[in-house]
Amino acid sequence: MDPNAPDSERVFGDFRNCLNTFDAWAESFWSGSALEVEQVFKVGDEVELVTPVSSKTPSKTVAMCSAQGSLTLVHMFESTRFVPIGNTPVMLQAIAADGSPMGAPLHRVIGLSGILEITECDRNQPYQITFYPTVSQDHVKALYASYQSVIAGLEGRLREEWTATFQPQWKDFASASSLQRSAMQGVAFSTGMAKALYSLWDNISQLYDLLADLKANSQKLLAYLSQAELDELLKLGSDAIAKGLLVLSDEPLLFIYVSAIVSWIRLLPPPEMYELLGEITGEVLINLLLMWATAGTGDTDGNPITAYTEY
């Protein structure tokens, strides 16, 4: 085997631990901006508050007790799957038309399920509801554990690609000349890849805003999509767009998929890697994420490796 071939087990190990890298990048480079995990407070289907998971500031909102005399409170992570945040104190205070408090407040705790049904409220009475977030390391561990099936599935696909395709190609490449030059080009590629990733994360929030008002921003999206791809995007229904927005707001999931693409590239033999050197840019990665996020594959079956090879 060519000694310059990648240590495939190290690549797979790095990918398995990609969420540790996510934490490091979030803290070191973006100070909690593009890579901040967020928590969601919901009251029924009408009210939704989103704040950084690191925030301990109480979140307040006003909602009406239903005609059935109940209110459903939910505390969860902003994710493509439901991951509850339990043990969250809440306070409900009935308020008058002028916003002044009426009577004694109700103090309750959202349990481990992340859902609390309040049945003691007065029908059609407005309440000020205050959530007191206390997100712990155990909560974050539970969030990360929810992604393990995604990571395992993608690692399996990477191993298949390595065994069936890349490993034989590396063996064929072992007798090629200019290995030292190849290694130097590989360093240049890595630098370009890092710059592309920085560009990608810098534009995540912009992508979210563009999709949130798709028709008004259609011309701006042409910076990332072809006209044909944009036409297909404009045909999507509101549910598909909403799912795409949720995917783009699920930063750990996005990071997992980008990490899978990076791992796939790390396994490539030099000839294939150099071919990509001039093609991998922040815009290319953004294009991939846009196509993936809005194609209805923002779940455990989504496969950025297939998307990239097809792209």
Place the predicted regions along the sequence by residue:
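Cationic, glycine-rich low-complexity segments
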Residues: 1-266, 302-309
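Hydrophobic, membrane-inserting alpha-helical segments
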Residues: 271-311
